[in-house]
């Protein structure tokens, strides 16, 4: 088994794991305590950044969750998860993939750090970046008017990558993220068996 994915519970690793599960891929999953650079220092020998997810596929090594997910659908497809250049929604598909991390997940990383890892150090940043994240959901909420999915009238990688930000918002207690259209959309996505399985993977320390 050449394909390996390293991840932590509730991390951005959910994106490629969910993608792999939807595609029925054969892969090895290594779950670690968060953050692994602190609690599993030997991981730095595998990924010098100490970040998750990390994917190894033969000689290929990748560190970015959206890029890994896109690699999987393009390398191991064809898959309906991919929107191809000949489809009308291809530009929107690409935009949502980049939007998922650059626009949505970025402010959440600040909240995660100062709410869970270093509580009390920067409470103003937690409040400010939480508001900033919620304000950035306008486009998503509007796009989901009368839509079940983001692109091409089907479930795609765009739904996987963007919805992770909402899943993380729930974990961080940012309840304002669940606007009506977004809640309807995520209720549907998060009931998918592949997502439920992906969320169920946990680090189990050796006894």
Predicted regions and their residues:
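Long hydrophobic alpha-helical segments typical of transmembrane helices together
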Residues: 182-207
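Active-site-flanking alpha-helical
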Residues: 73, 165-166, 199
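Conserved beta-strand edge residues that scaffold enzyme active sites
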Residues: 33-36, 158, 203-204
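GST-like fold's C-terminal all-alpha helical module
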Residues: 97-191
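A generic structural-conservation signal
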Residues: 29, 153, 178, 198-199
């Amino acid at each position: 088994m050449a394909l390996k994915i390293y991840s932590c519970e509730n991390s951005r690793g959910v994106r490629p794991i969910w993608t792999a599960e939807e595609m029925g891929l054969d892969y090895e999953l290594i779950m670690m305590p968060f953050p692994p650079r602190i609690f599993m220092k030997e991981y730095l020998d595998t990924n010098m950044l100490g970040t998750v997810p990390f994917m190894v596929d033969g000689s290929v090594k990748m560190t970015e969750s959206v890029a890994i997910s896109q690699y999987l659908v393009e390398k191991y497809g064809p898959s309906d998860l991919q929107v191809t250049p000949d489809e009308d929604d291809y530009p929107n598909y690409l935009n949502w993939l980049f939007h998922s991390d650059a626009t949505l997940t970025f402010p959440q990383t600040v909240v995660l750090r100062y709410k869970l890892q270093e509580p009390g150090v920067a409470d103003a940043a937690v409040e400010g970046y939480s508001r900033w994240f919620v304000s950035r959901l306008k486009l998503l909420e509007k796009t989901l008017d009368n839509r079940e999915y983001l692109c091409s009238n089907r479930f795609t990688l765009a739904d996987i990558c963007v919805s992770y930000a909402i899943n993380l918002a729930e974990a961080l207690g940012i309840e304002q993220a669940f606007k009506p259209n977004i809640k309807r959309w995520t209720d549907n996505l998060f009931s998918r068996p592949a997502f439920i399985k992906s969320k169920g993977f946990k680090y189990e320390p050796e006894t």
